[in-house]
Design a protein with these regions (language model features):
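Membrane-interfacial helix-loop segments of redox and metal-homeostasis proteins
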Residues: 1-138
Length: 138
């Protein structure tokens, strides 16, 4: 079943805010929260993430009917990519390699911002590229 495109974009906006605060404060705890949010989105789809729940319960009822839908697989893959970057960032911050924490968190922030501000999902594009490459290889 396809999903409302506004949900992942809302999640990207919240993620952008959270990751910006992580970079400003260097908070490993807040990055751990974001890592968990990515993990839930990767495991169960964006609707199962905390931000998906917020969108579904607080935001979507106040919006009009969705006019655009997308397959859930690309955003789910994007959550897994975000999980990888957040996990590396979390390792960096907790092991004292702050440069690694900042670099990985900054990369995740850039991707989230692109989705939130412009509707361009880097992880989704990666998913489509991987699909094209694997279909050709078969």
């Amino acid at each position: 079943m396809d999903i409302d495109v506004r949900g992942p974009r809302f999640g990207a906006a919240v993620t952008t805010l959270v990751l910006a605060v992580v970079l400003i404060t260097g908070s490993a705890w807040l990055l751990a929260w974001q890592t968990l949010a990515f993990a839930l989105g990767a495991a169960g789809g964006v609707g199962r993430s905390p931000y998906g729940w917020l969108f579904r319960t607080l935001v979507r009822p106040r919006l009009g009917r969705p006019t655009e839908f997308e397959s859930p697989e690309p955003p789910r893959f994007a959550q897994a990519v975000g999980l990888a970057f957040a996990g590396v960032g979390l390792l960096g911050f907790t092991l004292g390699a702050d440069w690694l924490g900042v670099a990985a968190t900054g990369a995740a922030l850039a991707a989230a911002f692109l989705n939130a501000a412009f509707g361009y999902c880097l992880g989704c594009e990666m998913y489509l590229l991987v699909r094209r490459l694997t279909v050709r290889a078969e």
